Amino acid sequence: MPPHFIDGEPHDHHHDRPRRVRVAGEPVRIGIGGPVGSGKTALVAALCRQLREELSLAVLTNDIYTTEDADFLRRHAVLPDERIAAVQTGGCPHTAIRDDITANLDAIDDLIAANPPLDLILVESGGDNLTATFSSGLIDVQIFVVDVAGGDKVPRKGGPGVTFSDLLVINKTDLAPMVGADLAVMRRDAEQVREGRPTALISLTEDPSSGPALAWVREQVRILADVH
C-alpha cells in the first residue's frame, strides 16, 4: 500500500487501531465525500464560515498526492491554519477513509490535542466515484455531495454514497437550466433510492450559507453531542 502523509510528513499506518467508541465530550465527526468537482471543499468552506462563531471546529482533508484542498481552505481563511490538517493518501482516495483509516485517526488526534476543546471535525474525502463511503470507525455521520452538472440521471444511478449517506447534497442547482437537468426528477429519484434519508438541493452561488445542509449539520451536532 502506498505511504500516507499528514501535512507532508510520512506516516506509518502499519499498526492496529481499535474500532471507535463514542465518548462524552469528544467532537462530533462528519464526513463529506463525493466525486471530483462536486463541491465538497466549497461546502466545507461554507460550513466553516457559518459555524466558526458558534462552534469550535476543525477540518481534515484528504488528497492523493497534494494538500490542495487544505491549502484552499487556508488561503480563504475559513479557519485558523492550526485548525486545518491534510492527509495525503498516496493511492485510491477511499482507502484512507474506509479500509485503512489510521492516518485519518491520527490526524484527528493531533487536531484534538492542538485545539481543545473541539465541538466538530469535518473530514473531507478525496474526490472519488459513487461507491465511496466512510468507515463508521472514522466518522459519526456522512454527507455525500453530487452536482447537477452530471445530469439528472445521477441520483437514480445509486451507489453506496448516494443511497446510504446520512445526507445527500445535490449541489450547483443554478446550473440545471444550462445542462438540461430537471431538479424535480433529481429529488424524486433521490427520495426513491434513499428510502427516507434526507436530500438537500443547494447552490452555493445563490446561497453561500449552504442553507439546508447547514441546518442539517447544526442538528447533527446538537443530537450527537448529547449521546454519551
UniProtKB/Swiss-Prot annotation:
GO terms for molecular function: GTP binding; GTPase activity; nickel cation binding. It comes from the Bacteria. SUPFAM superfamilies: P-loop containing nucleoside triphosphate hydrolases. It is found in: Cytoplasm. Signal peptide: none annotated. InterPro entries: CobW/HypB/UreG_nucleotide-bd, P-loop_NTPase, UreG. One of its GO terms (cellular component) is cytoplasm. GTP binds at residues 34-41. Keywords: Chaperone, Cytoplasm, GTP-binding, Nickel insertion, Nucleotide-binding. Pfam families: cobW. Its main location: cytoplasm. One of its GO terms (biological process) is urea catabolic process. Facilitates the functional incorporation of the urease nickel metallocenter. This process requires GTP hydrolysis, probably effectuated by UreG. Belongs to the SIMIBI class G3E GTPase family. UreG subfamily. NCBIfam families: ureG (TIGR00101). Homodimer. UreD, UreF and UreG form a complex that acts as a GTP-hydrolysis-dependent molecular chaperone, activating the urease apoprotein by helping to assemble the nickel containing metallocenter of UreC. The UreE protein probably delivers the nickel. This is Urease accessory protein UreG. It comes from Rhodococcus opacus (strain B4). The gene is ureG.
